[in-house]
Design a protein with these regions (language model features):
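Structure-specific nucleic-acid interaction/processing domains
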Residues: 1-138
Length: 138
């Protein structure tokens, strides 16, 4: 179960690409900050009605997702998901916005220096044009 603004979140909003999240292990308080897409690309094959392949998008596995950190995934598999709280911190309209907000929070909370986080690396490549909508509100 995901939470957003202290309420259970079940929507898959068309207008958002994805979100930045925090997963907390309830017994230890240890956390993980990451990002996840609501959608994944899918290419439909040619058929009798289509002479070309069509690119579309389908819902991703975000509802069951517990981060990309291997140690965290293993703990969830071994002990079950009930011991973890998943919170959406920011809904994002673009992939660039997701990458920016994820990196911003990871640096803000020193996730690589702190033993309070599962994060093991920060990877991002963001151009200012990818976050132009964020710049307008800055």
């Amino acid at each position: 179960m995901w939470y957003y603004n202290n309420e259970e979140y079940k929507d898959t909003p068309e207008e958002y690409q994805g979100f930045v999240y925090e997963i907390t292990e309830l017994s230890t308080g240890k956390k993980y900050i990451g990002k996840k897409n609501f959608w994944r690309p899918k290419t439909l094959p040619k058929n009798s009605r289509r002479s070309r392949r069509v690119k579309t998008r389908v819902e991703s596995d975000w509802r069951e997702y517990y981060g990309s950190n291997v140690a965290l995934q293993r703990l969830v598999e071994e002990h079950g998901s009930d011991g973890y709280k998943r919170v959406i911190l920011h809904l994002c309209k673009t992939k660039g916005e997701m990458s920016y907000m994820e990196a911003k929070l990871q640096f803000m909370f020193d996730v690589l220096l702190s033993d309070e986080y599962y994060n093991e690396f920060i990877g991002c490549k963001i151009h200012s044009r990818h976050i132009s909508k964020l710049k307008e509100n800055f």
